[in-house]
């Protein structure tokens, strides 16, 4: 329980940020500017919401917890123009918030239980995003930034790095939250590539190849991609079919996807 009488709800994955030093450091990393079009996902009790409002004067926020949503609207009434959407961020169309000539900046202390599906949801709307700053489970950030050859490199690494430059910023200890989570967190900055690394490759096509490859990561690439590409085709692309999926670079996954698309 806390000062507003709201117990953190496990089903929402709630851990409320309360460490002022962390909040200030996160604010410096985001560096909000007066004309920014910004949305906060999962504002909770408003630890970041209030300083963002002080900097911007206006803010969009998405909060699924109805009680917290009502509390935030009341608490921020005299602090600035907070437009709160009491909806599920996993199904929210962020394009409704973007303006024709202004992209959206997205920030948030994301619940651990939805962080990966939410990232994929946002990647599907990458064209309207300026950048993203998230507090995530440290393990997730490690996977986002992982390079080929390591155990952390996988589908999430390839897909996010296809869309964004990944910049891990700093670790946040569990004691910065109430209640404290069982693991540490990390703040990460995601900046969309402009122009796209491969404008002719769709999300669906790359995801099809990468998902199939990593669904059987212990197998060789030739076995993992059976039905999509043959060993001979891999060799023609200069890729050793005996390699394992976690050793293949993003550039090679793009080459595999281009080849597969041409063969359709």
Swiss-Prot record:
Keyword Glycosyltransferase applies: no
Keyword DNA-binding in record: no
Disulfide-linked positions: none
Signal peptide as annotated in the record: none
Record-linked InterPro entries: KsgA/Erm (IPR001737), rRNA_Ade_diMease-like_C (IPR023165), rRNA_Ade_Mease_Trfase_CS (IPR020596), rRNA_Ade_methylase_Trfase_N (IPR020598), rRNA_adenine_dimethylase (IPR011530), SAM-dependent_MTases_sf (IPR029063)
Cited SMART domains: rADc
Function, as annotated: Specifically dimethylates two adjacent adenosines (A1518 and A1519) in the loop of a conserved hairpin near the 3'-end of 16S rRNA in the 30S particle. May play a critical role in biogenesis of 30S subunits.
Family the entry assigns: Belongs to the class I-like SAM-binding methyltransferase superfamily. rRNA adenine N(6)-methyltransferase family. RsmA subfamily.
Protein name as it appears in the record: Ribosomal RNA small subunit methyltransferase A
Gene expressing this chain: rsmA
